[in-house]
Amino acid sequence: KTVQALSNIIKKLEATLKTRITHVYVGFGGQSIIGVKNTNVRELSTESEVTQDMINELMDANRSMQYPDQQILDAVTLEYKVDNQYQAEPPVGVPCKRLEGNFLNILCRREFYRRLKKCFDQANISILDMYISPLALADSVLTDSEKRGGCALVDLGADTTTVSIFHRNILRKLSVIPLGSANITKDIASLQIEDGDAERLKLKYASAFTDGNDIDQARHYAIDSDRFIEMSKFVDIVEARTREIIENVKSLIPDEYSEKLLGGIILTGGGSNMNNIERAFRLYTHIEKIRTAKFVNDTIKSTNPLVNAKDGRLCTVLAILAKGDQNCAGSDIASSLFEGIQTTQQGQATPTAQATSAKATNGRIIDDAAKEKTQDNAKADDNGRVKVESSTRNEQNDKPKQPHKLLNKFKVLFRKITSPDEE
């Protein structure tokens, strides 16, 4: 099903854009990822100055850390400890007898990652790069001052809620809660209501917080022409699940940072559109500074109403789009008899130094084998394309130019119509 779904998406996009799609960028997120801290220590026999090689050895040792059934997608350096002193930057040149490196490893289930890549391979879709979605999202919706001063980015999705904690420009914690706005819909549907009607009621009437004085005990919401639900019961259902999600978010904020989040909490995602969501977060987290990121910081021009709605639902997709630095489009698709097949190099994927680097940055997922394969394929495609175009140009130069056969037929027909000898 996944393979078929991927193929259908590509076909629909190509039909809409009238352009071949040669490569794609992929965002990796959801319940499959988690951030886990790890510490590596190097004891020195005598006091010595820290070298870059020592730093690299700590990082390599961390990368080599084995987790049961999981693999490291990316590693964030949290801090270094030189004897008893903590340092944010690599302490090269500092004398010590004990060097410690603290890291946040972002993990995913190894089998899930393998199956995901296999689905793309079976669908014949080339992956140009993979990004960890929460990190890409953070780069697109958070300000520098929020990351520096400390903040919690909360992505309220349909099935999951992702919490990313930043402080001093460093990701400190990454967690995914298996609860989202779809759970609210399911709770409403549990009252013998169709899923579609439950979703409609949620979008129209749901509020993350309703003051007791605003609840009208005599008011009912229409489910359909014959059925109604009491406002008070509806409010209780929505607020109970919303509060559960928010309290789970609060529990994931480490005590050491609870008083240091100068940037407050930033909400995004489709669930952030619920009425009074900011008020509910202030009430249950006791953090006063709350804002909602409805759109990415990048300037994006589009005629698509979903993009222009700027309601937070597409922030992650647009964030991954902003990360891409290569064109994924291939040749144009001919839509009529008179449109020839155009040869273009704009969709050619030529790996840059950044794309083929052995180290992942800004949430880019490390996959050396895939990078080498992409680079080799791109070079082969480049050489093949150049040869074909060169051969085609030579053939065209050698052949005398002749009118198109269909054009000749039109000329003959036109002469018959306009001939003065015609009876």
Residue ranges and their predicted role:
Residues K1-H23, F28-C151, A208, M231, ...:
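Nucleotide/phosphate-binding catalytic cleft detector across ATP-hydrolyzing
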Residues K1-T16, T185-A189, T303-D311:
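N-terminal phosphate-binding loop and adjacent alpha-helix
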Residues V24-G30, D144-K173, I188:
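Gly/Thr-rich phosphate-binding beta-strand-loop-beta motif of the actin/hexokinase/Hsp70
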Residues V26, F120, D155, I188, ...:
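Residue-level signature of catalytic and energy-coupling elements of molecular machines
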Residues F28-G29, S207-F209, L261-Y284:
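Glycine-rich phosphate-binding loops at beta-strand->alpha-helix junctions
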Residues Q52-N56, Y284-V317:
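Conserved phosphate-binding/catalytic loops in two-lobed NTP-binding clefts
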Residues L73-A75, C151-D155, R200, N308-S331:
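A polyampholytic, Gly/Pro-enriched intrinsically disordered region
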Residues N105, R110-K118, P134-L135, F166-T242, ...:
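Phosphate-binding glycine-rich/basic clefts of nucleotide- and phosphate-handling proteins
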